[in-house]
Amino acid sequence: MPEIRITPASGTVVVRAGGAVIAESTSALMLEEDGHDPVFYIPRGDIGMTFLDPSATRTTCPHKGEAVHFDLVAKSGPIRDAAWSYETPHDAVAAIAGMVAFY
């Protein structure tokens, strides 16, 4: 299993799409996994969830579990599977449960 590190993100994490701020958080977590770029996971309370529609996409990571995906509703049109969340991740990454990450 690759080494996975989860730490509080420093500063403010902001997600923008189509000119709109979709998320802004000082409580985000940064997940670093060997062989992958770091990923910010943002609490749902810091996300404009009205911009996100659940999609039918599900993916599985052997180290984190099953992810549900979301389409982003933007002025310019939907952005398919723009975000994902591990609702019930494996114990080793339980800190990201229910948080949302964006591509």
Predicted regions span which residues?
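Terminal leader/tail segments of proteins
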Residues: 1-103
